[in-house]
Amino acid sequence: MYKGWDSEALSIQSEIVNEILLYCYLTPQPPIPSETTTATSPTNIENEISNLESSENLEELKRLSVALNIDRRCNICSIVNLCLKQNKSWIYDYSLLCYKCNYAPKTPLSLLIVSAEFIMLIRERFPNINFDGLFQNNIVSIFDFHVHFFIHRCFANTVNDHIQSENITLNHMAIIRSTLLKEDSIPHIKIKKFLTKKMNPKKTQSPELNKKLTVPMKTRFTTLLFYMWSGTNVFDRVPFTDLTIRKHRFIKNLYSNKTDIELTAGPILLAQIPFSITKNKTTSVCLLCELMAASKQDYLFLKYLHQSIMDYCQNNLKMIDRVQFVIADIFEKTKIHMHVKNLSDYSKAIFDNEFSFSDDNFTLDTHVYLILRQTGTVGVYKHFFCDPLCLANCKTINPEVLFNTTDAGEIQDLKVTICYRNEYLSIVEKHVWLAIHLFKAFQIIKPNHKNKTQIAEFLKDFTNLLALHHFDIVDPIFTVNYYV
């Protein structure tokens, strides 16, 4: 019985999971020798971008970007149509998947879960149809899932302004394609028109449906989270040597036409901006957004952490100091750092996860401790107070939908109700997501005179747009220059 967002069905041994991960790695080209670059050169964003440009397979990138054309059919919609011709009742499971996706944060982990569950649903329900080799045979790419479930949201309610919706999707695609192909500029998208967009009150929740989801699931994806980003710069301060070796061995043993993968970048094509970079102790993949999508326990801890920072004291401390003091207090209270000391490999600590602290306010175990250790004070500060994508994810997620189900005897009725009510509501407006996507692209682009002018023009309107939609955030001018 399909329940959605079920970690028991998607373990790190899952062939579907590992197949998706494999095809979300980029294939490197042989490195190009350079007399000006040495092994001891200081690492900065300009050097990293330059190195990436010379190492990635441009032919593969061009092939992947085919899915980012507005006049190309949606391959996921085509598969859905094929499945419905075989068995119309299949749409009920698909509707539950879409409903859960609707309240999921836009993170690589969320996209991996949605993609894996979709493939699992079609393979298990239609064994007479050959759905093997979807990625290997270029039937789909991960960008088909990006567009279908998180950008255009093909399953969602019909909007009145079809052309504006089409143009927003077109702009999203252009942003991804320009960053994927490492172009020198970002598409010039004017967001000022969204400031005059009429703000009509709209429904953002389905309380009648949501109240049916009352049974907590024992779902938790933190092990998968460590697995997918082990051996990458996302975990550059917390090594997982054995876990990384296991992952690389597993995905390389899959039958595939990929002969080599860019290991340190990880499955970066799962990210909203498919570009692996670090800057000022932040990475282009936010682990705290990933953690939100992992379980209700982890979501509630992050909610407690944020409230503790806000309530820390009545004095006018800077937010970064509040973050540092609160995390130090939590570590001192939980004592997990006493058991999980400096190790050369934390893989065993992940699988054992034997140390945990819980009280009336929060639960913290080895998994969360290691993620906080990796993100550090700056990463927590950026997530809660600086990054508009993180804040949009916080607004979007509904843990009661993602991590709950209903009684076994009622779940089919729930799926039917979801299907016929067709309420896939957008919490954050589609044009706001576009503006945030553009902001994230500006964070990683190589600076030049043209880009600086474009960024300055964009930020003026972006700041006003965030205020209009009640995004209480540190000045984006700071964030766009200092973090990724």
From Swiss-Prot:
For this record, the Gene Ontology CC terms, alphabetical, are: host cell cytoplasm; host cell nucleus; viral envelope
Task: Look up the domain of life of the source.
Answer: Viruses
Q: Which UniProt keywords apply?
A: Host cytoplasm, Host nucleus, Metal-binding, Zinc, Zinc-finger
A Gene Ontology molecular-function term?
Answer: zinc ion binding
Localization in the cell = Host cytoplasm; Host nucleus
Ligand binding (Zn(2+) 1):
74, 77, 148, 154
Q: Which residues bind Zn(2+) 2?
A: 286, 289, 383, 390
- InterPro entries, from UniProt? Herpes_env
Annotated spans, Zinc finger 2: 286-390
Question: Any idea what job this protein has?
Answer: Plays a role in efficient localization of neo-synthesized capsids to nuclear replication compartments, thereby controlling cleavage and packaging of virus genomic DNA.
Family under the similarity heading: Belongs to the herpesviridae UL32 protein family.
User: What protein is this chain from?
Assistant: Packaging protein UL32 homolog
Write down the species: Human herpesvirus 6B (strain Z29)
Q: What is the lineage of its organism?
A: Viruses, Duplodnaviria, Heunggongvirae, Peploviricota, Herviviricetes
